[in-house]
From Swiss-Prot:
Entry superkingdom: Eukaryota
Keywords, comma-separated and alphabetical: Actin-binding, Cytoplasm, Cytoskeleton, Phosphoprotein
InterPro entries given in the database record: Ermin (IPR045346), Moesin_tail_sf (IPR008954)
SUPFAM superfamilies assigned to the protein according to its UniProt record, in alphabetical order: Moesin tail domain
Name used for this protein in its record: Ermin
Stretches with biased composition (Polar residues): 1-12, 21-30, 225-234
GO biological process terms on file: actin filament organization; morphogenesis of a branching structure; regulation of cell projection organization; regulation of cell shape
Annotated source species: Rattus norvegicus
Positions of region (Binds actin): 263-282
Bias (Basic and acidic residues): 212-224
Primary location group: cytoplasm
Compartments, as annotated in UniProt: Cytoplasm, Cytoskeleton
Expression tissues: Expressed specifically by the oligodendrocytes. Highest expression seen in the spinal cord followed by brainstem, cerebellum, thalamus, and hypothalamus. In the myelin sheath, found mainly in the abaxon and the lateral few terminal loops. Its apposition to the myelinated axon, through the latter, defines an axonal subregion, termed juxtanode, at the Ranvier node-paranode junction.
UniProt-annotated stretches for the region Disordered: 1-71, 212-246
């Protein structure tokens, strides 16, 4: 047997109209018989209308299968897009802040726009009067500050000059006291030096006088005829001349010793004592 497909509309299937041209019922049936023709069955073939639905289901399944592995890529793209959007937002915020600051700078430099509005004559007069009052007040303050500074400078200068004078007077007094003390010390030292010199000279003269008779006796013994029989006794004139020469020598020797002692006294005490003793033993 051969099957003949028959297509029916929805109304015909529902029984609204009877079938035309003696066609069979709405559903396609196929009657098959076995070789024994004991069993019959009806098979419904799929119509063409159901085929696109299956194809669409297969395509949708394929599309779902294709979408599943792309999830990670989509997430990456979304993350990148969010980062780009955040960067754009930050950039826009920075631009707005820069614009605001530039606008504030221009307003600060050029002044507010309401200040640039031309004023009436009455308003101008009032503003000028206010400005004059302010300028006068400022000038008065400046004058007062200048006068105050001048008085301070004068007072400070007077104080400084008085302090300087006091310091100078103190220094002069200290110098005078110092000079007086030095002069007194010098006078005392000179007096002590002179007293010591006089004492030394007196002692030296005493020693020299005590030693001079011994020297004269020794000289007389040498000049006596007993010691030198061939020698002749000197005349009194010669003895006077010898006595004068001896006095001159004594005076010069004592003077030399006093001068040298004064020179020696300026050095060390031990050194000058040793030198003086050595001079005494000459």
């Amino acid at each position: 047997m051969t099957d003949t497909p028959v297509t029916l509309s929805g109304s015909e299937c529902n029984g609204d109209r009877p079938p035309e041209n003696g066609q069979q019922p709405s559903s396609q049936t196929r009657k098959t018989t076995d070789a024994d023709e004991t069993q019959t069955y009806y098979g419904v073939e799929p119509s063409l209308q159901h085929l696109p639905a299956k194809e669409n289901q297969e395509e949708s399944g394929n599309s779902k299968g294709n979408v599943l592995p792309r999830g990670s890529e989509d997430e990456k793209i979304l993350n990148e897009n969010t980062e780009e959007n955040l960067f754009v937002v930050h950039q826009a915020i920075q631009d707005l802040s820069l614009q605001e600051t530039s606008a504030e700078d221009t307003v600060f430099q050029e002044g507010h726009p309401w200040k640039k509005i031309p004023l009436n004559s009455h308003n101008l007069d009032m503003s000028r009067q206010k400005e004059r009052i302010v300028h006068q007040h400022l000038e008065q303050r400046e004058d007062e500050s200048a006068a105050h500074q001048a008085t301070e400078i004068e007072w400070l200068g007077f104080q400084k000059s008085s302090q300087v004078d006091i310091l100078h007077s103190k220094c002069d007094e200290e110098e005078e006291v110092w000079n007086e003390e030095i002069n007194e010390e010098d006078v005392d030292e000179c007096a002590e030096d002179e007293g010591e010199d006089e004492v030394r000279v007196i002692e030296f003269k005493r020693k020299y006088r005590e030693g001079s008779p011994l020297k004269e006796e020794s000289l007389a013994r040498e000049d006596s005829p007993l010691s030198s029989p061939s020698s002749q006794p000197g005349t009194p004139d010669e003895q006077l001349v010898l006595g004068k020469k001896g006095d001159i020598a004594r005076n010069s020797y004592s003077r030399y010793n006093t001068i040298s002692y004064r020179k020696i006294r300026k050095g060390n005490t031990k050194q000058r004592i040793d030198e003086f003793e050595s001079m005494m033993h000459l």
